[in-house]
Amino acid sequence: PWQKGIDDPDCIATRDAMVDVIRFWLEHGCDGFRVDMAASLVKKDDPDKSGTSHVWKYIFDRVRRDYPEAAFVAEWSNPPQAADAGFDMDFYLNEKGNGYSTLLRDYGNHKDEDHSFFKKNAKGDVTSFVEEFQKYYDKTKGRTYISLLTCNHDTIRAKETLDDEEIKIAFATIFTMPGVPFLYYGDEIGMRYEHLRTKEGGYFRTGSRTPMQWTAGKNLGFSEGCADSLYLPVDPSDDAPT
């Protein structure tokens, strides 16, 4: 009862405001948007996310009239639903129990019980990933792109459990699968997952959000400021990758 209907005048006004914000940035040269939690616009939506899809279609219909080449990437982790809503790409996220989670991070809370497919001698099984990816691909081919990612700000870096050779094979696979792959900053140089105390609700994710390591200089090239002024510390190791 606390939520107004999706076509209530106030809700439509909110949608129009979203359109204005998107148009503003596209007018200033942005190529598109990555949308966080794109599937969660309408609370208590049905399983098909028809309400949320309705809202996005309204928005895209107005934006694409003048910006048909703008790219929109969803953090939805359900490519068929994201395609129905009008997105160009959708992240296939590392979520417990899905196919992607079996590739690099199939260890739950116990890394000594790691069964990741790309980890040597872990006896991992790629079947669930292949079957789920094929299902998504068959339903989205020609409509939207599946985006596999090496990591993101909500996921432990692969470097935490995979060695360099395992990572090379894993990333080569990600970058040769159908779709649009995404490389998380720092993964290209082998940035490590840092074991840090949670900050601002980051919890375990905090260790994947440390500054980019550009050079071997002060603060690994991220800032000329004092080290204790950084939002999170850089890798303190003598062999920190840059």
Model-derived segments and spans:
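Loop/helix patches that line or flank the sugar-binding groove of alpha-linked glycan CAZymes
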Residues: 64, 78, 86, 112, ...
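A structural motif
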Residues: 30, 38, 179-180
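Active-site beta-loop-alpha junctions enriched in small/polar residues
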Residues: 38-40, 75-79
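Generic structural signal for well-ordered alpha-helices
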Residues: 22-23, 53-61, 130-134, 171
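Aromatic- and acidic-residue-enriched segments that line the glycan-binding/catalytic groove
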Residues: 46-53, 82-101, 197-215
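Substrate-binding/active-site clefts of carbohydrate-active enzymes
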Residues: 1-28, 46-47, 56-59, 65, ...
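Conserved, mostly hydrophobic/aromatic
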Residues: 18, 25, 35-36, 72, ...
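The substrate-binding groove and active-site-proximal loops of carbohydrate-active enzymes
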Residues: 1-16, 39-53, 112-126, 154-163
